[in-house]
Amino acid sequence: AAGSLKPKEVRIPGVLVDYIVIAPEQTQTTQTQYEPAISGEISRPLSAFRYMEHGPARVIAQRVAQELQSGDAVNIGFGISANVPRILLEQGRHGDVTWLLEQGAIGGVPLLEFQFGCASNAEAFLPSPQQFTYFQGGGFDLTLMSFLQIGADGSVNVSHLPARPHVTAGCGGFIDITSHAKRIIFS
């Protein structure tokens, strides 16, 4: 109803709304019906997060973790990079760095697989466009990126998959983030 919100609290003006759809079956993520730690309502105990299994991906993630310095603001991408926070957690280094996700989470413990892009126990959430403004300003220390292929000349393929059904995955925020990163670590 008109006047029910203060003007600065309005996110979508009524003139732009034709319908409101209530979807009670809407999930929070593709694999999560609802998890209050993702929305910041509760804090999930650090002991509840699973660690990486032993194998090549773990060795790579451990090596990447050695490059991180206390106080770093670090963007992470999908793939092996997404496991680095678990390595720090296991090493008792949780909180040494601040994780920055494209989707807007700052801090906390970034989640994995189809929950990637979310974080439990985040310190803050920014709208994704504001997070990208921060990335474009170069205010972060480094980014941990995954890739599909890297050529001998240093060219990086992040979006073209060789087989169907996934002919292209899309570059996501790769270009914006890597163009403004002080350091880039591929894993």
Locations of regions flagged by a protein language model:
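N-terminal active-site beta-alpha-beta segment that forms phosphate/nucleotide-binding
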Residues: 43-124, 128
